[in-house]
Amino acid sequence: MIRSGAGTEQLARQLSVAVVEDNPHIRQLLQDEIHDEGHRMIGFSSAEDFLATYGEESIDLILLDLMLPGMDGLSCLQQLKINQSQDGCPRVVIVTALDDAEKRRIALDNGAEEYNLKPDLFLRLPDLLQSETTATEEARRHP
């Protein structure tokens, strides 16, 4: 687990990325991409599993599917924002197959920073991880 100020410069650049995705194939593809970029992925197949362990590990970025069994991604996002600590919630990026303007608006209004369609996410992921790495390093240097 990587915490603020811990480890070497190389470790400081490694992100912990939570992926909340019920499709095991997509979760594995994301894990491969995240690992290839030098980061760590923690996978969850449901919003309930994610929320039950949220806060136990340091997480820098959350990739959250909208269509999940049980609690959906929007409800999970709302719960995250309600329960966030004073330090704030990590950046949340919605990952979905739903190209739905209303869902996009609701997600962004509820604190998601981005709304990505799944096919596009794989093209966007390296840049997304790099920008988050830069932001995380800056936050660690200037707490």
Feature names for model-found ranges:
Residues 75, 99-116:
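Alpha4 helix (beta4-alpha4-beta5 surface) of REC/receiver domains from two-component response regulators
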Residues 43, 68-71, 109:
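Residue-level signal for the "D+5" position in two-component response regulator receiver
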